[in-house]
Amino acid sequence: MKIYQCAFCGADIPPGYGIMYVKSDGTVLRYCSRKCFVSATKYGRNPRKLAWVRKLQRKQKQSTS
């Protein structure tokens, strides 16, 4: 089984979880949660400007090191 990464926050998505969003041009985007999906598609937010995304990325970086 392949583990995908969230297109918004970069978190790992285990098999059977998350949201797969297919755009009209055929591009597949995978999101770990509804929060990431709505932030990216409905609100058009930039993940680099959100504190919770930066906190999650720091946590993941520490766990891999």
UniProtKB/Swiss-Prot annotation:
Its cofactor is Zn(2+). InterPro entries: L24e/L24_sf, Ribosomal_eL24, Ribosomal_eL24-rel_arc, Ribosomal_eL24-rel_N, Ribosomal_eL24_CS, TRASH_dom. A zinc finger (C4-type) spans 6-36. Pfam families: Ribosomal_L24e. Keywords: Metal-binding, Ribonucleoprotein, Ribosomal protein, RNA-binding, rRNA-binding, Zinc, Zinc-finger. Gene3D superfamilies: Ribosomal protein L24e. GO terms for biological process: translation. PROSITE patterns: RIBOSOMAL_L24E. Binds 1 zinc ion per subunit. One of its GO terms (cellular component) is ribosome. Zn(2+) binds at C6, C9, C32, C36. GO terms for molecular function: rRNA binding; structural constituent of ribosome; zinc ion binding. It comes from the Archaea. Coiled coil: none annotated. Part of the 50S ribosomal subunit. Forms a cluster with proteins L3 and L14. Binds to the 23S rRNA. Belongs to the eukaryotic ribosomal protein eL24 family. This is Large ribosomal subunit protein eL24. It comes from Pyrobaculum arsenaticum (strain DSM 13514 / JCM 11321 / PZ6).
